[in-house]
Amino acid sequence: MKLVIDAGNTNIVFAVHDGSRWRGTWRIATDAQRTSDEYGVWLTVLLDRAGIAAGGIDGAVIGTVVPAALYHLRRLCRDWFSLEPLIARAELDWGFAIEMDNPAEIGADRLLNALAAHHGYGGPLIVIDFGTATTFDVVNGNGAYVGGVIAPGINLSVEALHQAAARLPRIGIGRPQLVIGKSTIPAMRSGIYWGYVGLVEGLIARIEADFGAPMKTIATGGLAPLIAEGTSRIEHTDPDLTLEGLRLLALRNPAPVLRPREAEHE
């Protein structure tokens, strides 16, 4: 069984795959100061409740866009599971070309989404990830990663609106039935929701125009189903896309070997 860890700016997702299916997924808020022992106690309790023996986990892979969290996640794998984790990075064997000026600067989550989306849906395609940032990643028909777009995330935009305008409250995100709001909060909700639907539709159209052909569109991230309700341009939503990318990456790359000194506490 493989321990798969997807560390984002907002949440860290832990999952276990037994070679045929996901046995469980668990989510915790990202905190760069949380120690490996805190992760270990929390995770082993959840594994036990799911009937998963920690000793049966024989591999680990980590994808993170939070460098400060990597140290403790690596120590978790070493100290609690006696494993040296594979760390997702551009230099690994992805099975596709990365056609970027500086591949090393690309967030691992974007490459992982591209890997899983092309494997599951074929190309050419656009992967949209509704996270802290809203990213659009483009994969051609041969599976090569050819670039993308980064826009502010929905929650980030909501918070910025509240912080910058003293009289605008902090609001929840939902789909308004009407575009024209009759008071402040409905007007804000409409601007956020339908504004992001418009951003999605507009960027898909512009990406396809640049690419020169229609493309499949796959969305992931917590808000993907909600945004997909408002547009026909999102063809599939896949909540486990990044986890699946990590699983596939681990299949393509040999597991690192845990050296004795790495198993000791630093």
From Swiss-Prot:
Domain of life assignment: Bacteria
Main subcellular localisation: cytoplasm
A GO biological-process term: coenzyme A biosynthetic process
GO cellular component, one term: cytoplasm
Disulfide bond annotation, renumbered to this chain: none
SUPFAM superfamilies with a match to the protein in the record: Actin-like ATPase domain
Keyword Lipid biosynthesis: no
EC number: 2.7.1.33
Recorded metabolic or biological pathway in which this protein acts: Cofactor biosynthesis; coenzyme A biosynthesis; CoA from (R)-pantothenate: step 1/5
UniProt-annotated location(s): Cytoplasm
Assembly and interaction partners: Homodimer.
UniProt family annotation: Belongs to the type III pantothenate kinase family.
Protein name per Swiss-Prot or TrEMBL: Type III pantothenate kinase
Top-level taxonomy: Bacteria, Pseudomonadati, Pseudomonadota, Alphaproteobacteria, Acetobacterales
Gene: coaX
